[in-house]
Amino acid sequence: MTQQQKQVTWVTLIVVVALVLDQALKLYIRTHFQLGEAHEVLPFFQLCFIENDGMAFGIEWFSKIVLTLFRIAAVGVLGWYIHLLIHRQARTGFVVTTAFVMAGALGNILDCVFYGRLFGYAGWLQGKVVDMLYFPLITNSAGECLFFRPVFNLADACITTAVIVILLFYRKDLDASLTKKTDDAKA
């Protein structure tokens, strides 16, 4: 098996496994929890059911359909970028990490495209993203979270973790791939 074939296999595996885990957890939470319901798993970790219209960690901007269409276009560009990385024989770690960004983006897109219609509260492209992971790491005496309030999902975790790993360990690879694209466009 060539290096390119191995990278394609890794990308496919990561995207499929991450999507299956993300969607399975979201569907479980959506069908077994009431909106706003929370269960403590560990003193610093809760599963709770919230939905958001926005981006990662509930950030909101633009209309729902515009945001969903933007996400779909961004995943298309990201898929093309991963294809170029593989074709240009980028390091496997960089390709794999970038695949986690794509997997996370696809996970949230599925919510937006299908969940509104599937659960009967909105049309196509207008679904809400299901979030459930909550880590109230530091709380006050009243139990109110003082540090790290976001509730997020596995897709958000894939994106955020991958971006941090890219910035910490693959910055040169990222810079080189972007410079290479610019140089190719000039030629």
Named regions from a protein language model:
Residues M1-A187:
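Alpha-helical transmembrane bundles and membrane-interface segments of multipass inner-membrane proteins
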